[in-house]
Amino acid sequence: MSSPEFGSRSFDVVVIGSANLDLVATVEHLAAPGETVIASGYAEHAGGKGLNQAVACSRSGGRTAFIGCLGRDGAGDILRGVLADEGIRDFAVDTNVPTGRALISVDEQAENSIVVVPGANHHLGIGVVDDHRSILSDTAVVLAQLEIPLDSVEAAFAVARLARAITANKTA
């Protein structure tokens, strides 16, 4: 993405955002309040809107970096492995809080029910943004989403805009 407008930057895209381990149960139908259902299948996947954005950007050929917060736990190790395997520069911060999780039930009609446990994602504060100012200033685009604190998104975008980077926020 080297162009006169963006000059020579280290990254095409920096994503600041969430990373979760998705725990997915396949069920015949979604549970009603108070009902217990038996799953016919189970899988774990890397997830979180931020991590998903970073993977998509990297797979599209962009030089991609990820800034987020992970726990010092097995889920954090799995997600760091995904970042490495996908060729994404990992600037994730370790926390003493468990890595975020999403508990997902998917029924036979592909309808789902999701409970998100933010965990470490909610510890992505202004301090993390400040610690990564040089990364946020050395990219053409900064992507974010609202699975991390809003004040951190605003601070990251302020840094990026000073460096004349494009900013984009996925609100849903």
Locations of the language-model features?
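Short active-site-adjacent helix-start/loop capping segments
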Residues: 23-25, 74-77, 99-101, 113
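A broadly tuned preference for mixed-charge, low-complexity surface segments
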Residues: 63-72, 149, 153-157
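Glycine-centered flexibility motif
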Residues: 34, 50, 71, 100, ...
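Beta-strand->loop->alpha-helix junctions that form or flank phosphate-binding loops
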Residues: 16, 40-44, 67-72, 87-100, ...
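Glycine-rich phosphate/adenosyl-contacting loop at the front of the ribokinase-like
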Residues: 1-69, 76-81
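Short glycine/serine/threonine-rich phosphate/pyrophosphate-binding segments
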Residues: 49-52, 75, 98-100, 151-153
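Ribokinase/PfkB-type carbohydrate-kinase core domain
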Residues: 2-19, 77-94, 104-172
